[in-house]
């Protein structure tokens, strides 16, 4: 089941990302509207009419001219296309950041897995990343107090029994983080935990 758009918007607001948050979008995300403002969004790999499949987060830092793509499984571009039929190159091309004078931007993409293979918590991990971006826009992927709470593993080991305890611990840290920082999460904790559990996809 995973996270609904309503849940993600409420949690992101609680986390203080409101001034920069453009919203939740399906795969037709129009990109960033201003090349001069900090901005972020949560984007689904599928069309809204499907009910959604997998959440990712995009963020734009105009000072460093860096676009961040946080995808909790750390899939390669090829794997994203293979598994979700999702490509982000056209998204970046049609974004306002591509119209900056020198059109030279840096793309920084997550490459490690922080989410378990059967977990449905992708949207919640995106919220966690956006909290890091809102507070440490120069280093949102790591080396900050929020993302330091979780540990990435090589994507090639995503399904390995060896790393499942680490990935499960990441999800427990995620829930604890949201318990501390989001009143909405606290009020709906049981429901959200059930819909995003570590073994949710295996049990479907």
From Swiss-Prot:
It holds the Pfam family Peptidase_C5. The record marks 51-52 as: Cleavage. The keyword Protease applies. It is an enzyme of class 3 (hydrolase). The active site is at residues 54, 71, 122. Its EC number is 3.4.22.39. Keywords: Autocatalytic cleavage, Disulfide bond, DNA-binding, Host nucleus, Hydrolase, Late protein, Protease, Thiol protease, Virion. GO terms for cellular component: host cell nucleus; virion component. It comes from the Viruses. GO terms for molecular function: cysteine-type endopeptidase activity; cysteine-type peptidase activity; DNA binding. One of its GO terms (biological process) is proteolysis. Induction: Expressed in the late phase of the viral replicative cycle. It is found in: Virion; Host nucleus. It catalyses: Cleaves proteins of the adenovirus and its host cell at two consensus sites: -Yaa-Xaa-Gly-Gly-|-Xaa- and -Yaa-Xaa-Gly-Xaa-|-Gly- (in which Yaa is Met, Ile or Leu, and Xaa is any amino acid). Requires DNA and protease cofactor for maximal activation. Inside nascent virions, becomes partially activated by binding to the viral DNA, allowing it to cleave the cofactor that binds to the protease and fully activates it. Actin, like the viral protease cofactor, seems to act as a cofactor in the cleavage of cytokeratin 18 and of actin itself. Belongs to the peptidase C5 family. Cleaves viral precursor proteins (pTP, pIIIa, pVI, pVII, pVIII, and pX) inside newly assembled particles giving rise to mature virions. Protease complexed to its cofactor slides along the viral DNA to specifically locate and cleave the viral precursors. Mature virions have a weakened organization compared to the unmature virions, thereby facilitating subsequent uncoating. Without maturation, the particle lacks infectivity and is unable to uncoat. Late in adenovirus infection, in the cytoplasm, may participate in the cytoskeleton destruction. Cleaves host cell cytoskeletal keratins K7 and K18. Interacts with protease cofactor pVI-C; this interaction is necessary for protease activation. All late proteins expressed from the major late promoter are produced by alternative splicing and alternative polyadenylation of the same gene giving rise to non-overlapping ORFs. A leader sequence is present in the N-terminus of all these mRNAs and is recognized by the viral shutoff protein to provide expression although conventional translation via ribosome scanning from the cap has been shut off in the host cell. This is Protease. It comes from Human adenovirus C serotype 2.
């Amino acid at each position: 089941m995973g996270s609904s758009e309503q849940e993600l918007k409420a949690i992101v607001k609680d986390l203080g990302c409101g001034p920069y948050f453009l919203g939740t979008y399906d795969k037709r995300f129009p990109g960033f509207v201003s090349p001069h403002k900090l901005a972020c969004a949560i984007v689904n790999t599928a069309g809204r009419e499907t009910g959604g499949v997998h959440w990712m987060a995009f963020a734009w830092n105009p000072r460093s001219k860096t676009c961040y793509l946080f995808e909790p499984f750390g899939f390669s571009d090829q794997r994203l296309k293979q598994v979700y039929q999702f490509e982000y190159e056209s998204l970046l091309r049609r974004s306002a950041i591509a119209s900056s004078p020198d059109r030279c931007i840096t793309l920084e993409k997550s490459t490690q897995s922080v989410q378990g293979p059967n977990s449905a918590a992708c949207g919640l991990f995106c919220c966690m990343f956006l909290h890091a971006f809102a507070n440490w826009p120069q280093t949102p992927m790591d080396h900050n107090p929020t993302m330091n709470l979780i540990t990435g593993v090589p994507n090639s080991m995503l399904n390995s029994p060896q790393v499942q305890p680490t990935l499960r611990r990441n999800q427990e840290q995620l829930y604890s983080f949201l318990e501390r920082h989001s009143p909405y999460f606290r009020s709906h904790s049981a429901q959200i935990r059930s819909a995003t559990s570590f073994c949710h996809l295996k049990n479907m």
